[in-house]
Amino acid sequence: YGPWVNSDNWVHHVLTRPFVDEPGGRMLYSTGSSHLLSAALTESAGRSTLDLAREWLGEPLNITIPAWDRDPQGIYFGGNNMALSPRDLAKIGELYRNEGRLGDRHLFPENWVRESWIERGRSAYTDDPYGYGWFQQPLAGEMGYYGRGYGGQLLYVMPARKLTVVMTSDPTPPSPGSAFLRRQFQLIEEHIIPAVEN
């Protein structure tokens, strides 16, 4: 991660790294790969990822999306450093929980949410299945989907229980890692789910 963000050209740096496995083989999450999506979207749309996020999510959900870090070429970070409030992040989780619907509008193509939740690989760190930007973790007998950020930031969506959970944590290094993530899941399963069911 360090050599990548300290390079002069993040996209070039990612594209010139060797594969960790053959295509279709072992998956190793890479923030650099997520950044490539931001670069491709910026290039194809002719607009910044920030502008698109504000138009496609910020305006319809009535959330504030502040500017975040960019690479040396001016492309907004595709893998991290967004600074959403917990309430605004919960609105994005609710949008996914409702399959991309906001009232009677679809903000995403109809099958996008289900497609994004299909297992495409497994985390080398947690062994959790991974789709398009979402990991899977069942809790209390129901499948849930989560995105996690540095330092223990967590968005967890459980459609069957009509539940969206946002957890924020101290992002001061070092990152607490997978053991902390498991404690967050335990908190959801043992305390939050029973609280909303009662």
What do the PLM-derived regions correspond to, one by one?
Residues G149-N198:
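Structured C-terminal helix/loop/strand segments within mature extracytoplasmic catalytic/sensor domains
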Residues T42-R54, G100-F108, A124-Y125:
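Structural helix-adjacent loops and short alpha-helical linkers that scaffold large soluble proteins
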Residues D8, I63-P66, V113-V166:
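Active-site Gly/Thr loop motif
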Residues D71-L84, Y130-G141:
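Carbohydrate-binding/catalytic loop surfaces
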